[in-house]
Amino acid sequence: MFDMATKTKKITKKNIAIDKEVVKALDIDHLKALSLNPHDWHESGTCEYRLYAYLSTFFKGTTILDVGSRTGGSALALSYNEENQVISYDLVEQGASSIKRDNITWKIQDFRDDDTLDYDNISIIMIDVDPHDGKQEEEMFEFLEEKGWKGLVLLDDIGPLWPDIEDFWNRITFPKLDVSDVGHMSGTGAVSFDSKHKLSWK
């Protein structure tokens, strides 16, 4: 997308090769047990939570942002690797803050207004916000470009059920991978933001 000045980052470049069989077999029952909606925790390809948990294992000692807390499922999945800290954001409380886990912090605010963040130490940003019109997502991408951030972005609902998000996904020029096979049934995408990481299937 936009060319940004190169900055030194604390997080080294990763070769993120996704092993479908490992994702499918990942045990996340301990996280499901903490969920407000355990009936939503289905197998990979229907539900994205095993994929999110798996991707958290590529990083150590970093911060992961969950943009769009809702009832906390995605934050729980992203908290799988306890060596990382997850910060989950929503504009309205929807019950997630009742979930207690040592490496999750819940915040009611726009993440772009959080001046406590160290973007050099943010490894993953998961974006799943309403109203799924593609406009907010594009504005968030522009914000991250202005910050000069580099890392892994996860997007939900990139398939034809949500045409505005699908259109936004198709216009992304950074290296990207449709990971819906082990993600959510409505489509899940992974983006190497500013070409930080190499994304592939194993």
Model features per residue range: what roles?
Residues 1-202:
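A short alpha-helical cap/connector motif
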